Amino acid sequence: SLIPALSMANAARDRGQVESSVSKAIRFSMIIAIPAAVGMAVMSKPIISLLFGAKNSEKAVLMMRLGSAGIIFYSLSTVSNAILQGTSHMRIPVRHALMSLCIHVVVLLTFLNVFHMGIFGVVFADMIFAFCMCFFNAVSVRRLLTYKQEVKRTFAGPALCAAVMGVFAWFLYGALYRIFTGFAYRVLAGTVITVIAAMALYAALLVRTGCITEYELTYFPKGKQLTAFFKKLRLLK
């Protein structure tokens, strides 16, 4: 949905609408991607246990924890690709992908053949590919659209809220795991409860800290109901 909106604003030469659409797209993607990365890192052990079993899962857990940052980079690169395409710069993301792929191949071969990092080299090389895409796209967006990225409410705020959420989830899951001792599905129960509670806490923190305003809530599905709910909890004034 981002590309048509940007294309219309760009065709009308409405720079204000273009910048507004770009800002909203990046902000909303980071609001989702940053806590997702934190959640995958914190909950990597129970998630791997549920998917593949707990036996000999230490390496897989570590891979998920290390690679979770890639969620942020891939999300940002996907959005920035759409921004460039929606503003009539169709070939630039392709060129950036080719450049990033070349860097990825060189880094991957170095990690595997020089540093002998094994599968972890693949994880880090994949993240470097996504990071390069983000970097190249960001430079082009700034140069072509004269767009200056806001940092506080787009990156710093969600990161702080996600960090609090991550600490909360870590301790809550540990407590639930001990409470459910003897219960056959304690990993599943602990994971589901922790994820739901952590999501609720993160949403409350976003609203309370002003990372999301009442006006911006209306852009979400069931926005009016969410606004009324947060006002009842006195998280919105």
Task: List each language-model region with its residue ranges.
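Helix-loop junctions and terminal segments of transmembrane helices
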Residues: 1-26, 81-83
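Membrane-interface junctions at transmembrane-helix termini in multi-pass inner-membrane proteins
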Residues: 69-99
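Residue-level recognition of transmembrane alpha-helices
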Residues: 29, 64-67, 71, 97-98, ...
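Membrane-interface helix-loop junctions in multi-pass transport and translocation proteins
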Residues: 91, 101-139, 143, 149, ...
